């Protein structure tokens, strides 16, 4: 007498930004929203080769056991889908989010946000032709902009490395766009401080922490406030 346990028998899907994450030592591995794990029934409920192999094995061992044939869902072929609307994030930022002002950067949790993106904004005066910036303790992936021009992208362990930028004006706008790529949902890191997203310490210009930040929460739960009539860059 024995039994088998299939994990999983039926694949599934997480929607939106609820993808989750696996903890592996000091590294977090974001998961995709497809939750399949080579299941006998795939994400859309269709049988796979594994399903038919199990069916064959069961029929050989238990020939009298009735087995129904699974339904196969119809799907359309993949085609190119043209974009009808597009707009730059900076162009429509004020229509989709209102800034929260603080001296130092706040985490996503401190701002009452669970998932999505968070844009940090401040300004810096030009003291030299080149400035060294560092984002200290950020999660999970960042893009840094000077006057809305992309300068660098950093991910996980890269965050904290020096970013050298040219400041073209006397006063320059600094934007740091942070993406929350998923929190762990089991294991030793479940309640760890590393699961707090956004900038958890601060941003340094040379040896000093930058202050006077505006934070724009971007959960992206709705597109109703996006103004597509504005500029695309």
Residue spans for each PLM region:
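Carbohydrate-binding surfaces of carbohydrate-active enzymes
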Residues: 2, 6-230
């Amino acid at each position: 007498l024995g039994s088998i346990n299939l994990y999983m028998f039926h694949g599934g899907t997480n929607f939106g930004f609820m993808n989750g994450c696996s903890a592996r030592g000091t590294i977090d591995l974001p998961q995709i929203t497809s939750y399949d794990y080579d299941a006998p029934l795939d994400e859309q409920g269709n049988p796979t080769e594994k399903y038919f192999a199990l069916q064959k094995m069961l029929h050989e061992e238990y020939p009298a056991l009735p087995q129904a044939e699974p339904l196969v869902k119809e799907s359309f072929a993949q085609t190119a889908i043209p974009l009808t609307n597009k707009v730059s994030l900076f162009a429509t930022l004020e229509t989709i989010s209102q800034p929260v002002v603080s001296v130092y950067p706040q985490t996503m949790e401190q701002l009452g946000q669970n998932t999505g993106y968070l844009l940090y904004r401040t300004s810096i005066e030009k003291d030299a032709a080149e400035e060294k910036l560092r984002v200290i303790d950020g999660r999970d992936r960042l893009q840094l902009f000077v006057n809305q021009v992309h300068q660098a992208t950093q991910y996980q362990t890269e965050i904290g490395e020096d970013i050298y930028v040219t400041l073209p004006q006397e006063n320059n706008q600094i934007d740091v766009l942070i993406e929350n790529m998923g929190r762990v949902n089991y294991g030793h890191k479940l309640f760890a401080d590393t699961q707090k997203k956004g900038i958890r310490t601060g941003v340094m210009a040379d040896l000093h922490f930058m202050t006077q930040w505006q934070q724009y929460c971007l959960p992206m739960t709705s597109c109703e406030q996006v103004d597509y009539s504005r500029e695309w860059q």
